[in-house]
Design a protein with these regions (language model features):
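N-terminal post-signal-peptidase region of extra-cytosolic proteins
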Residues: 34-37, 63-72, 86, 148
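Short, glycine-/polar-rich solvent-exposed loops and beta-turns at beta-strand/coil boundaries
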Residues: 42-43, 62-63, 95-100, 141-144
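Short extracytoplasmic
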Residues: 42-68
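Flexible, acidic/glycine-enriched loop-and-adjacent beta/alpha segments
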Residues: 71-125, 178-188, 195-198
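Non-catalytic, structured segments within soluble enzyme domains
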Residues: 23, 116-228
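Structural signature of transmembrane alpha-helix termini at the membrane-water interface
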Residues: 21-32, 103-106, 110-114, 133, ...
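Solvent-exposed loop/turn segments at secondary-structure junctions
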Residues: 58, 67, 89-91, 109, ...
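N-terminal type II signal-anchor transmembrane helix
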Residues: 1-52, 90-91
Length: 228
């Protein structure tokens, strides 16, 4: 190996080493400044406060948020599959962050920027749990790094089923409804046990933009989003 290529190799290895040290330092710094996530293991979201008459008729609902907690084992498979299909197809195989999804979104967003189209996200369901429970909606690299670190840690601490349970009971689906059970009653006036796949798919279409795709606002747009 001549001297020129030897110098190039030394410079390249030095650059890679320094870059690795920088990245490790940044991640270490963020890792020591993220919220505590361990409470999620036993967390149950607040539910609606309702008053019923003697014959079982709903008299009053004192909560601003419509929410009904449903354990994972009581959530129908068609509802789970609809949300996985719409939000995170690789949920059961990734470790919290979907590298393939990030790469795909990066490539697609190059075209989207050129054509002035809406940018794609690449957040997994676990990342959404991290954001919804522990972070803000701030759009920044700072938040995305924390979100990714939290997602990896949450995946190590909780089962996939528990993460899905948290997500499906916490996600905002428009019209004041939080979680799939409350949204099922709000939009279809039925229990999630009675939802058909088309109805489940419509609910799964809402997380990206609950107001825009709200079926009360524009049923055709909601169906269009459902069918994507």
């Amino acid at each position: 190996m001549n001297k020129f290529f030897k110098n190039i190799l030394i410079i390249s290895l030095t650059f890679v080493l320094l870059l690795s040290i920088l990245i490790i330092g940044i991640l270490w710094n963020y890792s020591n400044n993220i919220p505590d996530y361990k409470f999620l293991k036993n967390y149950k979201p607040p539910v609606s406060s309702k008053v019923y008459s003697g014959d079982g008729e709903l008299v009053a609902d004192f909560s601003q948020e419509k929410r009904i907690f449903v354990p994972f084992n009581s959530i129908p498979k068609n509802v789970i599959n609809a949300f996985l299909s719409a939000e995170d197809k690789n949920f059961f195989s990734h470790p919290g962050v979907d590298a393939k999804g990030v790469l795909r979104a990066f490539i697609n967003n190059i075209t989207n920027i050129i054509t002035a189209k809406r940018l794609e996200g690449a957040s997994t369901i676990t990342q959404q749990v991290a954001k919804n429970f522990l972070l803000t909606n701030e759009i920044s690299l700072n938040r995305k790094i924390k979100e990714a670190i939290l997602a990896f840690r949450i995946e190590r601490a909780l089962s996939k089923e528990r993460i899905l349970e948290l997500y499906l009971n916490q996600i905002y689906l428009g019209s004041g409804a939080y979680g799939v059970a409350a949204a099922s009653l709000e939009y279809f006036d039925k229990s999630i046990r009675d939802l058909n796949y088309s109805e489940a798919a419509l609910l799964a279409a809402l997380p990206k933009a609950p107001s825009r795709y709200n079926p009360y606002r524009d049923i055709e747009l909601a169906k269009f989003r459902r069918n994507l």
